[in-house]
């Protein structure tokens, strides 16, 4: 009888613990889901539903080496915009200007978490603290 009670308690506790997830997982989900909504509102019109970009004007966000090698500059690009040609994939240039965005560091972090973990990218959570630090280093 005791064994059944203990086994039942262990099972219930296991289910509860498994359903909670870690603090990091929950933080990632909050940033990602918030970023998805912001992307749809502010970025999707140019970068596309699937991050495919637009011809030679708007660069794609799909598994872009640019995102991975310029992670520290992404907050600056989102915040300040970008003018002039940019080479993103395989030396291909894109000439469309990206406007500056009036977004808080936490909203920039949300968008970057979404973009850097969608469209074939898997780069983890970008926090508002990361963004605030990166914005101080904008050139």
PLM region spans:
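The canonical Cys-X-X-Cys-His
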Residues: 35-49, 111, 115
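Conserved helix-turn-beta segment immediately C-terminal to the redox Cys motif
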Residues: 65-70
């Amino acid at each position: 009888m005791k064994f059944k009670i203990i086994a039942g308690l262990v099972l219930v506790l296991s289910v509860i613990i498994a359903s909670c997830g870690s603090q990091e997982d929950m933080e990632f989900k909050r940033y990602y889901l918030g970023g998805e909504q912001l992307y749809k509102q502010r970025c999707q019109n140019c970068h596309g539903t699937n991050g495919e970009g637009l011809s030679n004007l708007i660069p794609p966000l799909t598994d872009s080496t640019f995102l991975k090698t310029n992670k520290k500059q992404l907050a600056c690009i989102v915040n300040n915009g970008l003018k002039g040609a940019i080479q993103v994939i395989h030396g291909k240039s894109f000439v469309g200007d990206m406007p500056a965005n009036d977004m808080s560091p936490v909203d920039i972090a949300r968008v970057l978490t979404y973009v850097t973990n969608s469209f074939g990218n898997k780069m983890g959570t970008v926090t508002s603290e990361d963004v605030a630090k990166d914005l101080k280093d904008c050139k």
